[in-house]
Curated annotation (Swiss-Prot):
CRAL-TRIO domain mapped to chain residues: 99-272
The protein, known as: SEC14 cytosolic factor
Pfam (any one): CRAL_TRIO
Keyword terms of this UniProt record: Golgi apparatus, Membrane, Protein transport, Transport
Membrane topology designation: Peripheral membrane protein
Matches recorded under PROSITE patterns: CRAL_TRIO
CC terms in the record's Gene Ontology section: cytosol; Golgi apparatus; Golgi membrane
GO biological process, any: negative regulation of phosphatidylglycerol biosynthetic process
InterPro entries assigned to the protein according to its UniProt record, in alphabetical order: CRAL-TRIO_dom (IPR001251), CRAL-TRIO_dom_sf (IPR036865), CRAL/TRIO_N_dom (IPR011074), CRAL/TRIO_N_dom_sf (IPR036273), PI/PC_transfer (IPR051026)
GO terms for MF: phosphatidylcholine transporter activity; phosphatidylinositol transfer activity
Gene name in the database record: SEC14
Keyword Protein transport (UniProt): yes
Source organism (scientific name): Candida albicans (strain SC5314 / ATCC MYA-2876)
Subcellular localization(s) per the UniProt record: Golgi apparatus membrane
């Protein structure tokens, strides 16, 4: 593990986001937002917090709570308590998911290269999930630990490398959720895990979703989603794209063909086994790996 300080690692890659019309980002803050950010940091410092107080991290909590300082404080405090209780701060070295090569075939999840905005692209083939078989070799608790492990690997390794390659701060991912082959039974079996996984992402990794594509969505899925849209934040809704079976043209608008696997309509010719375990991206390229080191793996190759 690196002995460099967090400040030194942060200084090794861009901290200013790409230019945007949206305010609340390091590249576009109003005077009022700058003041709110300073007050937020000061109050957290007075509460005894010392870590994760950089501008980008704090702004994610503020954006998630519409720049309401007290709500952002409550969210931050709850997150820090969860990190301590769950062992998040040491999970990258403490947790080993040696069963992953087998689990991955029953619930394929993997990162593969980047989208046009420099985000790491995360694929999840939910339609292939076989929870009954999976629970014979792992547990839901270990699945959730692996999820958190991957979140931490993304935040500490993938995003810094992607930021160096892009030339600006990349703080979100692009997710492609493949629903091909999903059945009522498989969806029902995995709903408990999905619910817990969604809560972790929403409560403890705010503002990490850049783009979210649901492909091969069954008939009626879009209609059902429309019923929930009024209850969702408009910014969140704008990031979600529900696509049917003719998704390739839309997906290629966001992901370069050379980065999108052939199986999803791109030109990246890679086998399923390599997709599951190779973890290809800037975080494996020496040119973009910084003082944090190469992204670790939760299992031995």
């Amino acid at each position: 593990m690196t002995t460099m300080t967090t400040e030194e690692i942060l200084a090794s890659y861009p901290q200013i986001t790409a230019p945007t019309d949206q305010t609340g980002y390091t590249s576009n803050l109003t005077p009022e937002q700058k003041t709110t950010l300073d007050i937020f940091r000061q109050q957290l410092t007075e509460l005894g917090y010392k870590d994760r107080l950089d501008d980008a991290s704090l702004l994610r909590f503020l954006r998630a709570r519409k720049f309401d300082i007290q709500k952002a404080i409550d969210m931050f405090v709850a997150c820090e308590k969860w990190r301590e209780d769950f062992g998040v701060n040491t999970i990258l070295k403490d947790f080993h998911y040696e069963e992953k090569p087998i689990v991955a075939k029953m619930y394929p999840t993997y990162y593969h290269k980047t989208d046009k905005d420099g985000r790491p692209v995360y694929f999840e083939e939910l339609g292939k999930v076989d929870l009954v078989k999976m629970l014979k070799i792992t547990t839901q608790e270990r699945m959730l630990k692996n999820l958190v492990w991957e979140y931490e690997a993304m935040c500490q390794y993938r995003l810094p490398a992607c930021s160096r390659k892009a030339g600006y701060l990349v703080e979100t991912s692009c997710t492609v959720l493949d629903l091909s082959g999903i059945s009522v039974t498989s969806a029902y079996n995995v709903i408990g895990y999905v619910r817990e996984a969604s809560k972790i992402g929403q409560d403890y990794y705010p503002e990490r979703m850049g783009k979210f594509y649901l492909i091969n969505a069954p008939f009626g899925f879009s209609t059902a989603f429309k019923l929930f849209k009024p209850f969702l934040d408009p910014v969140t809704v704008s990031k979600i794209h529900i696509l049917g079976y003719s998704y390739k043209k839309e997906l290629l608008k966001q992901i370069p063909p050379q980065n999108l696997p052939v199986k999803f309509g791109g030109m990246s010719d890679v086998s399923d086994d390599d997709l599951l375990l190779k973890d290809v991206g800037p975080w494996r390229d020496p040119e973009f790996i910084g003082p944090e080191g190469e992204c670790p793996r939760a299992y031995n190759i």
